[in-house]
């Protein structure tokens, strides 16, 4: 920011666990929203901080989840619902052109990523499904061995 408080450069952050954290809180019966919450990141904080793009990782702990793919698909649904509720502020991006369009409109960009290959290790069709939902980044492993790596 300059002396007048104007943002000179937009930030593009390539990882946060906010959607996964909101998902877990809701599983515990607690209220949590993307717009404003007590987590590390919410839309209000992104706007104040001068963000242009936030990558939202869907994290599933293979050591705890019964079905990693199903769990991640539920998180995709949550991600889409939260974006719809806040569509005046943030939109999902699939291409660089989408990022440019959001910037022209004064909106934040949301990029979807997958953290843990066990989400899609069972079937190439699952990986295709997540791609169709907008996932553009994926990690093959986290802390557990899976069929993709160790």
PLM regions and their residue ranges:
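N-terminal hydrophobic targeting/anchoring segments and the immediately downstream early-domain regions
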Residues: 4-150
């Amino acid at each position: 920011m300059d002396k007048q408080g104007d943002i000179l450069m937009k930030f593009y952050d390539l990882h946060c666990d906010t959607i996964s954290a909101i998902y877990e809180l809701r599983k515990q019966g607690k209220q949590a929203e993307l717009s404003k919450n007590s987590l590390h990141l919410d839309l209000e904080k992104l706007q104040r901080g001068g963000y242009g793009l936030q990558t939202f990782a869907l994290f599933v702990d293979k050591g705890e989840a019964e079905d990693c793919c199903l769990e991640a698909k539920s998180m995709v649904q949550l991600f889409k619902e939260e974006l719809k509720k806040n569509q005046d502020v943030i939109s999902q991006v699939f291409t660089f052109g989408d990022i440019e369009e959001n910037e022209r409109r004064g909106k934040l960009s949301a990029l979807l990523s997958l953290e843990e290959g066990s989400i899609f290790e069972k079937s190439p069709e699952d990986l295709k499904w997540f791609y169709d939902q907008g996932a553009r980044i994926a990690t093959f492993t986290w802390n557990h061995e899976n069929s993709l790596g160790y």
